[in-house]
From Swiss-Prot:
Enzyme Commission number: 3.5.1.59
Organism the protein comes from: Arthrobacter sp
Catalytic residues as annotated in Swiss-Prot or TrEMBL: C177 (nucleophile)
Chain intervals for the UniProt region annotation (Disordered): 240-264
Pathway: Amine and polyamine degradation; creatinine degradation; sarcosine from creatinine: step 3/3
Coiled coil: none
Enzyme class: hydrolase
GO BP, sorted A to Z: creatinine catabolic process
Pfam families: Isochorismatase (PF00857)
An example Gene Ontology molecular-function term: N-carbamoylsarcosine amidase activity
Cofactor(s) listed: sulfate
Cofactor: how and how many bound: Binds 1 sulfate ion per subunit.
Protein name: N-carbamoylsarcosine amidase
Reactions performed catalytically: N-carbamoylsarcosine + H2O + 2 H(+) = sarcosine + NH4(+) + CO2
């Protein structure tokens, strides 16, 4: 363990206790107000690994995330279970083919003014998916240059043409590309499932906080064990039928409109 990773783990451990206390109080508030509902697993899933390219999984790059000694083995477990049932597996990587910010036709908008996009040229080693979780034959690697995997890509086309109802999302980062992909997925009618041991980020506490918030509002955060058990219990993918409608949820009564005193 390096000094840097040791410091990260120490801060993460100390933050965990504080965050758990905050989450316990927050969960009561959310439950009382009708949040934190479960969207549940559907019948016809796909897996998408968000930005598990070398820039995020290997040391030495500005985008590197710690915790890969946990993340990579859990991603491998999900791949093994998904492939055994013929479940589609997709990957994304952020790449930039026109990085000239002054050209007026760059493919990153103003993102270059916030993050070091110049360190991630297309076709570089850093933009390639980590060999430990390399795509199998026929699995698609989607190039993107936005946070979410949906805008400007064919992901939604791939999912709808395969009649996908559930999207299992892994990768990095929790606060950025994973979160935005999950938010877009639920808005487009897919059931987002996030295996908690497969999510990374660069700063202590960020993964824990974002998974808590995602679980309250945008998707179901589950253990990798639960996701693998779900995949293991599925029939072969070609024998599944999508579950398109959400399960009934308890309704919360809307508060009455506020009554304002007549102004004189």
């Amino acid at each position: 363990m390096t000094e840097t990773s040791g410091t990260f783990n120490d801060i993460e451990a100390r933050l965990a206790a504080v965050l758990e206390e905050a989450f316990e109080a927050g969960t009561s508030i959310y439950n009382e107000r009708g949040f934190k509902r479960r969207i549940g697993y559907g019948n016809r899933p796909a897996v998408i690994h968000i930005d598990l390219a070398n820039a995020w999984t290997q040391p030495g790059h500005p985008f590197s995330c710690p915790g890969m000694e946990t993340i990579i083995p859990n991603v491998q477990r999900i791949n093994e279970a998904a492939r055994a049932k013929g479940v589609p597996v997709f990957y994304t990587t952020n790449v930039y083919r026109n990085r000239d910010a002054s050209s007026g036709t760059n493919d990153m908008g103003l993102w270059y003014s916030k993050i070091p996009t110049e360190t991630l040229p297309a076709d570089s080693y850093w933009a390639q998916i980590d060999d430990r979780i390399a795509p199998a034959d026929g699995e698609v690697v989607i190039e993107k240059n936005r946070a979410s995997a949906f805008p400007g890509t064919n992901l939604e086309l791939f999912l709808t043409s395969n009649r996908i109802d559930t999207l299992i999302v892994t990768g990095a980062t929790a606060a950025g590309c994973v979160r935005h992909t999950v938010e877009d997925a639920i808005a487009k009618g897919f059931r987002p499932i996030i295996p908690r041991e497969t999510i990374g980020d660069r700063v202590p506490g960020v993964v824990q906080w974002n998974l808590y918030d995602i679980d309250n509002k945008f998707g179901d955060v589950e253990s990798t064990d639960s996701v693998v058990q779900y995949l293991d219990a599925l029939p072969q993918f070609e024998d599944t039928v999508p579950k398109t409608l959400s399960d009934p949820q308890p309704e919360v009564e809307a508060p009455a409109d506020p009554v304002f005193a007549e102004q004189h």
